[in-house]
């Protein structure tokens, strides 16, 4: 019986998947959410032995399969895989060194959020869905080139503080999370928020949602992420398009 036929409850699909499958699922679903700037973008997932799974440099997120996933050590040295690791993995390495509580990191150039990052603005929160990720977003405005430089990567991680989402000025988005479910929530929501904010401001703008309401919604997400069906629903949609993506 296939995953699509099981009628699993919320959380059961993810539990049945390997970490490699989860990385593929995160890449595939976020590609459809707008993280689709060709072969750019990278995802790392910390494993129990403190090595990391990472997507290959050569493949786009929408063609990724579980057998394509690479493994690296905590210094970025490749341990397995037939493809190569992105030269820009330094940002991930420094994040994982500094924050052992964060098991997933991702970087991409989604269309709408990157537009706001290039305008040096954090998009306001005008709707409930945008509020789910809270106000926990920073703008890192010291970007001066590639984040493969160690000192620049460390500076970006320091600037993030306890935030889970950073807009890298003139560059893109960096997300860090405790789990793949939260990584999907933060990454998909910042792109949704960026698009909605642009649309609202194109209509003339309005008052943003009160900070207390935003924080309340954000805390609800953190406390109940295991009961949110959104990520697994997105995974099932990808499996309908490509039943072999976990091969």
What are these regions (language model features)?
Residues 1-247:
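Glycine-rich flexible loops
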């Amino acid at each position: 019986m296939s995953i699509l036929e099981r009628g699993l409850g919320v959380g059961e699909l993810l539990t049945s998947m390997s970490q490699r499958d989860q990385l593929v699922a995160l890449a595939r679903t976020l590609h459809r959410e707008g993280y689709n700037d060709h072969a750019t973008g990278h995802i790392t997932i910390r494993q129990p032995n403190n090595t990391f799974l990472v997507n290959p440099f050569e493949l786009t997120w929408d063609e990724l399969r579980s057998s394509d996933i690479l493994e690296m050590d905590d210094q970025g040295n490749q341990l397995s895989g037939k493809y190569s690791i992105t030269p820009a993995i330094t940002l991930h390495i420094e994040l994982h060194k500094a924050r052992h509580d964060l098991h997933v990191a991702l970087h991409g150039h989604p269309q709408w959020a990157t537009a706001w990052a290039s305008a040096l603005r954090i998009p306001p929160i005008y709707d409930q869905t945008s509020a789910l990720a809270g106000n926990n977003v920073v703008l890192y405005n010291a970007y001066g080139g590639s984040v493969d430089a160690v000192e620049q990567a460390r500076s970006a991680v320091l600037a993030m503080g306890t935030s889970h989402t950073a807009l890298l000025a003139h560059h893109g988005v960096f997300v860090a999370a405790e789990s793949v479910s939260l990584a999907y929530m933060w990454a998909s929501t910042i792109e949704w928020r960026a698009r909605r904010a642009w649309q609202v401001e194109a209509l003339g703008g309005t008052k943003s949602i009160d900070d207390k309401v935003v924080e309340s919604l954000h805390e609800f997400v953190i406390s109940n992420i295991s009961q949110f069906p959104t990520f697994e629903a997105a995974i099932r949609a990808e499996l309908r398009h490509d039943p072999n993506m976990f091969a």
